[in-house]
């Protein structure tokens, strides 16, 4: 993996207007940064240490220095050792995201990033998309699809149960880099409101971004103090999306579509509005475990079979179909992928 110099990290922070002050000697600017860390216990020689978190304590920086840190990045209030080389920033979370992208050599630029946000259905839709893409990739003898979800994470090197929906920016960039190293072409991920609010996905550009729905949820002193904060966090997503797939059946659709204009292209889907780009009709419950419907697009008008019942899963499937169309996946792979798709035993 390419290694960047300390001066490169300073440059990218300056480019994003995050730097307030640089307090270090020119002699260390050409130091190769071998590690990026926000956990002081993991610091080694030539580490760029990030002072972040509500629970940050000065002793963490002291430990990082003892363990061999080259310099640290901090907001003004956490500059607890002014004599040690440091970079002062105005937003530590955006700074962490920016330097994480650089440390892993901007992996999101080398893979199709597919992000999903919404109150409900993210996990199911993520697995629908993965199943469709995996069917296509298998047919062409290509690596399968990486996924970062609230259920589990698979990046070609690691396969593990997920602890949170969207990981911290440095961990996310590692997963993306692993997928790139494994020659994967696509990565599907859930993008939570917290990830957007706390800038964990800052500087990640999505080839496809799906906005499933919005309703009052996650309102608490821990996550979002009110619905407006929650909704505004979700809407930040569109600024990072090239092709936006939007559910016309969602509440607050006018505001969603207004913000979706930030994307280069909007693809709509619906079970109610025939004018949608991807429209489901003739929905039939076949058994207690299966449902069928016809889907009409500009390219095809065909029947789809799902082995996960419920109208909400028809909406999730439409989102997956819209995504597949953006990526030019043929209908046969869409059909095959949805027919066998399961969300790791969980039905949303």
Task: Name each model-derived stretch.
Residues 37-40, 101-107, 346-348:
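A short, basic/flexible loop-to-alpha-helix module at the beginning of a structural domain
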Residues 96-244, 248, 252-265, 318, ...:
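Phosphate-binding loop of NTP-binding sites
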Residues 81-91, 160-163, 207, 262-268, ...:
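Active-site regions of enzymes building and remodeling cell-envelope glycoconjugates
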Residues 70-80, 149-152, 248-252, 271-272:
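Short, polar loop motifs at secondary-structure junctions
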Residues 77-78, 91-94, 213-217, 270-274:
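Short, acidic/turn-prone active-site loops that include or flank metal/cofactor-
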Residues 169, 223-231, 258, 262-348:
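Adenine nucleotide phosphate-binding catalytic loops in nucleotide-utilizing enzymes
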Residues 1-98, 281-282, 305, 309, ...:
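N-terminal leader/targeting and accessory segments in enzymes
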């Amino acid at each position: 993996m390419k290694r960047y110099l300390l001066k490169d990290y300073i440059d990218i922070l300056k480019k994003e207007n995050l730097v307030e002050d640089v307090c270090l000697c020119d002699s260390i600017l050409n130091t190769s940064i071998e590690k990026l860390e926000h956990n002081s216990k993991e610091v080694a020689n030539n580490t760029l240490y990030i002072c972040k978190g509500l629970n940050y304590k000065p002793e963490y920086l002291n430990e990082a220095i003892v363990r061999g840190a080259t310099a640290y990045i901090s907001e003004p209030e956490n500059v607890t050792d002014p004599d040690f080389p440091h970079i002062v920033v105005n937003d530590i979370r955006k700074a962490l995201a920016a330097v994480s992208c650089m440390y892993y050599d901007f992996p999101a630029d080398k893979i199709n990033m597919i992000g999903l946000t919404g109150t409900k259905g993210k996990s199911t839709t993520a697995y629908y998309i993965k199943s469709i893409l995996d069917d296509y990739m298998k047919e062409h003898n290509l690596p399968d699809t990486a996924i970062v979800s609230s259920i589990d994470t698979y990046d070609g090197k690691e396969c593990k149960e997920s602890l949170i929906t969207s990981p911290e920016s440095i961990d996310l960039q590692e997963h993306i880099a692993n997928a790139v190293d494994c020659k994967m072409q696509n990565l599907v991920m859930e993008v939570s409101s917290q990830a957007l609010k706390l800038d964990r996905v800052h500087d990640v550009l999505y080839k496809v971004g799906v906005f499933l729905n919005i309703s009052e949820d996650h309102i608490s002193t821990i996550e979002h103090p009110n619905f407006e904060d929650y909704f505004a966090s979700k809407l930040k997503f569109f600024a990072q999306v090239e092709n936006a797939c939007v559910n016309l059946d969602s509440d607050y659709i006018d505001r969603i579509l207004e913000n979706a204009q930030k994307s280069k292209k909007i693809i709509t889907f619906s079970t109610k509005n025939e004018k949608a780009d991807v429209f489901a009709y003739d929905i039939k419950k076949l058994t207690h475990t299966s449902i069928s419907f016809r889907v009409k697009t500009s390219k095809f008008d065909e029947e789809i079979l799902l082995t996960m019942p419920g109208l909400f899963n028809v909406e999730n499937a439409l989102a997956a179909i819209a995504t597949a169309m953006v990526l030019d996946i043929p209908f046969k792979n869409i059909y095959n992928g949805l027919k066998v798709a399961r969300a790791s035993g969980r039905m949303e």
